[in-house]
UniProtKB/Swiss-Prot annotation:
GO terms for molecular function: cysteine-dependent adenosine diphosphate thiazole synthase activity; iron ion binding. InterPro entries: FAD/NAD-bd_sf (IPR036188), Thi4_fam (IPR002922), Thi4_prok (IPR022828). This is Thiamine thiazole synthase. It catalyses: [ADP-thiazole synthase]-L-cysteine + glycine + NAD(+) = [ADP-thiazole synthase]-dehydroalanine + ADP-5-ethyl-4-methylthiazole-2-carboxylate + nicotinamide + 3 H2O + 2 H(+).
Amino acid sequence: MSDSDSFEQFSDVGEAEVTRAIGQEWTEEFMDFSDSDVIIVGGGPSGLMAAKELAERGVQVMVVEKNNYLGGGFWLGGFLMNKVTVRDPAQQVLDELEVDHKRSKDSEGLYVANGPEACSGLIKAACDAGAKMQNMTEFTDIVIREDHRVGGIVMNWTPVHALPREITCVDPIAVEADLVIDATGHDAMAVKKLDERGVLNAPGLEDEASGMDQTDDDTYGAPGHDSPGHDSMWVGESEDAVVEHTGLAHDGLVVTGMATATTYGLPRMGPTFGAMLVSGKRAAQVALDELEVDAEPVDVTSRDATPADD
């Protein structure tokens, strides 16, 4: 072997040492975040954006995501095409994330970016800011206090849900937080738990239809996307409405992103992500206000700003 082909051998570390390193680091981090300032349920674009903004301001944030991967639907645009769009002024968020983007050839005020670059850039930004990620972990319920104030979440390993019921006597655990953010997308899972108990006014869930999320011999739906809570697609109305309605839905619970549309019965916006990013920013500011954190305000974008050169 020539000198150019040689390399310094890996350190002499065995299997048990690898296992201990993983277990010790995970346990230490999890213990630190078992009682957090903010728990964000859902690691899609709005949840990650809120996590980034809060962590940058010194807020202790844990993101709970049921999938092995973070990012939700931000990896792809519509129809399995991996280009994502944002409408002005949300391209400013892509600038912040140092994500390349360009103006649409045919539409003024519409910008296109590479989905994997945008999504991975947002994940990295949230992690770099100090937000902690608990993936493969499924939200199952909320923790409540007096007057049903939200005080945390109940969660379990995601694979437990897929096991046959007769062998799944696996109790969940609970973690506490001063504030919970529902960023679970179309499902609005935390909001639904309160709605089921009759303690939350969620107009989008009051007359919830049935069958839209079912796929069997007699029905077809797109699970997680044809939510009965939100209205049909209307890009021009939906994005503004989602940002405007982002905020405190119940004492201790902030709603952001598509969970906002489901909660309030707003139209969906399809494969354009500006509202998801800006809604996450707004949710972070609401959280800062609720927690009375003395920090620099979150910069929610404005169309008065000068767009970046492409």
